[in-house]
A protein has these predicted regions:
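Phosphate/nucleotide-binding beta-alpha loop and adjacent structural elements of enzyme active sites
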Residues: 1-148
Length: 148
């Protein structure tokens, strides 16, 4: 398809995943870890974050290690493969972090490990200290269904 577009920090991953057939144009770019960005900009808290970095989620979390347990953000993480899920497990141990598989309206459920079902790739991940906050959010939106 001439309109097929994607972006990746790893051209090899792009070529080997999902049958991408488009042209690959490479650009040099500077990258930084979240930890260094947070320190450099004197950021004192992060409540909510979305991590969707096309199979570089483990690297993103490794670069956030210093502040992850300090800020304890609620995170929406896209996990595209079981290999990526396996790499995330030691970074988000289930004795400290909760995982909710976002599998459609009224189907989301708390799970012990990332499960890739190839229909739903998004997970809500939060520190166990945020249990009460998550329950309150669920109560507030119990009757909200964006698909009606």
């Amino acid at each position: 398809d001439e309109h097929q577009k994607s972006a990746s920090l790893s051209p090899e991953k792009l070529k080997n995943w999902g049958g991408y057939k488009g042209e690959i144009i490479e650009y040099d770019m500077q990258c930084s870890t979240l930890d260094s960005y947070i320190s450099k900009n004197n950021i004192t808290s992060i409540d909510l974050m979305k991590i969707d970095v096309e199979m570089h989620e483990p690297e993103a979390l490794k670069g956030f290690k210093k502040h992850l347990d300090l800020f304890k953000p609620i995170m929406m993480i896209e996990v595209l493969t079981q290999d990526i899920a396996n790499q995330l497990k030691p970074l988000l141990p289930n004795d400290t972090y909760r995982i909710i598989h976002l599998s459609g309206p009224r189907n989301s459920k708390l799970i012990k490990d990332f499960i890739i079902d190839y229909d739903h790739y998004n997970f809500l991940v939060y520190h166990k200290d945020n249990d009460e906050k998550i329950l309150e959010l669920i109560d507030n939106f119990a009757d909200f269904n964006p698909f009606n």
